[in-house]
Amino acid sequence: MNNYFFLYIFLISFSFVSSQSKLKKDTNAIMKMCGCFEVTFNFSETINLNNRENYKPSEDYQTSPVYELAIPIKQDKNHISIQHILQVGDDNYRSIVKHWRQDWIYQNKNLYIYEKDNKWNYKNLNKTNYKGQWTQKVYQVDDSPRYEGSSSWVHVDGKSFWENTTPAPLPRREFSKRKDYNVLLRSNRHEITNYGWFHGQNNEKVDRINSIEEEVLAFEVGYNYYKRVANDKCKYAKEWWLENEKKWDIVRNIWAEIYSQNKNLSLKSEYNG
């Protein structure tokens, strides 16, 4: 009897230590996405799946290298928030742009899943569906919702990566150009590399009528490279954030109150008042 008891205690202890070790690896991988990076964004529509007579695929989208500061604005055991800030131009002309934000939450059960037309449906996950997983919550430049997904970080063969597929609104590069689809089904891969990190995408451009009827118009691939550089390359972005972070703290807190209601969200394109 005692032997079984000690075996049980050993297995429980081993499981706990293993879980804590995995959590530390996950956290270290996420924190490696912070810093100053030289970034390039590259997208290409690869396969046309529709038979629409007047269909016009998107042109390839490639950017020149820009600096992007990814700064941790919250960091605890189960929640890491990273604000991205673009720094474009040189001493003759420089522009600072508050870019996207990503929150990583461990074993999160509350998701907002994008439906279409600026509508997100609240979803409460079962524990078996989020145990050991991290939710990546991605926000627009104004901290409004964009897309969310829950998956496990994987550490194998010297690689650390996280993969997930989730619906999202049209990207900014297409929002003003394309009206023939209304959902981008994003398959994201975030992988930590020896040069920084890589954001790969295999996306589907979807014309969604309702929860049952939809058409996949085309496939798209994306290759976004974040190459780590010296921190002083992003000094203007950091200065801008130090001057403006309190204002954005207020904005985030207002949005946090809305998200905490755990209800479906619908955003208006215009506000009259």
Regions found by a protein language model. Name each.
Residues 10-19:
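Hydrophobic h-region of N-terminal signal peptides that target proteins for export
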Residues 74-77, 81-155:
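Low-complexity, serine/threonine/proline-enriched polar segments
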Residues 127-185, 205-207:
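Short helix-loop boundary/capping segments
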Residues 182-189, 194-273:
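Acidic, serine/threonine-rich low-complexity disordered tracts
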Residues 1-6:
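Positively charged n-region of N-terminal signal peptides that target proteins for export
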